């Protein structure tokens, strides 16, 4: 049996769909590696390309490429996140984070353009004297994630996208002893 992390790219018999992964954010062997699983929300390049990080708004395991199993839960795209968070809450979280990503990284924001011009005209002294829009928005994102985690620590922990280079949005969920 083969286990694919990008399960929606491969569909063949006797392959296991994997919508959650071991907790890579703690040292191997700690008890948290077995109790929490990492559910990854991938970036969606079909919306804005690579202009700025944009995370998929499809609920994990229910993307257009996900497949339901007729052979039982082992081969199903079902995610453990579905038991923990509602669709509305998921869309609110991902939508809010996507908003921060746009404000921080989109080159077409007025603030980005003005800061670039001022930096150029002052020979980049402006960047040394003042915090950039990017830094301010990412600080707001950090605060949002900290508030979200303190409010929902018993259900899930949202990992700051900075920790994985903005490649995915990672939720750590309690699953007990995973049967993998």
Swiss-Prot record:
InterPro entries: Golgin_A_7/ERF4, Ras_palmitoyltransferase. Keywords: Endoplasmic reticulum, Membrane. GO terms for cellular component: endoplasmic reticulum membrane; endoplasmic reticulum palmitoyltransferase complex. It comes from the Eukaryota. It is found in: Endoplasmic reticulum membrane. Its main location: endoplasmic reticulum. The keyword Endoplasmic reticulum applies. GO terms for biological process: protein targeting to membrane. It is a peripheral membrane protein. Disulfide bonds: none annotated. Interacts with ERF2. Belongs to the ERF4 family. The ERF2-ERF4 complex is a palmitoyltransferase specific for Ras proteins. Palmitoylates RAS2, which is required for its proper plasma membrane localization. This is Ras modification protein ERF4.
């Amino acid at each position: 049996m083969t286990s694919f992390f990008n399960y929606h790219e491969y569909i063949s018999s006797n392959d296991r769909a994997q919508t959650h992964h071991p907790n890579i954010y703690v040292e191997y062997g700690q008890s948290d590696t077995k109790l929490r699983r990492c559910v990854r929300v991938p970036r969606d390049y079909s919306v804005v390309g690579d202009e700025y990080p944009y995370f998929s708004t499809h609920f994990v395991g229910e993307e257009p490429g996900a497949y339901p199993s007729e052979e039982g839960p082992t081969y199903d795209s079902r995610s453990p996140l579905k038991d923990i968070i509602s669709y509305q809450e998921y869309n609110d979280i991902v939508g809010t984070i996507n908003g921060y990503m746009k404000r921080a990284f989109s080159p077409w924001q007025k603030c980005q353009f003005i800061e670039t011009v001022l930096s150029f005209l002052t020979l980049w002294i402006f960047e040394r004297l003042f915090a950039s829009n990017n830094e301010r928005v990412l600080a707001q994102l950090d605060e949002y994630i900290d508030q979200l985690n303190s409010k929902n620590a018993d259900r899930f922990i949202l990992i700051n996208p900075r920790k994985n280079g903005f490649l995915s949005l990672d939720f750590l969920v309690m699953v007990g002893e995973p049967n993998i």
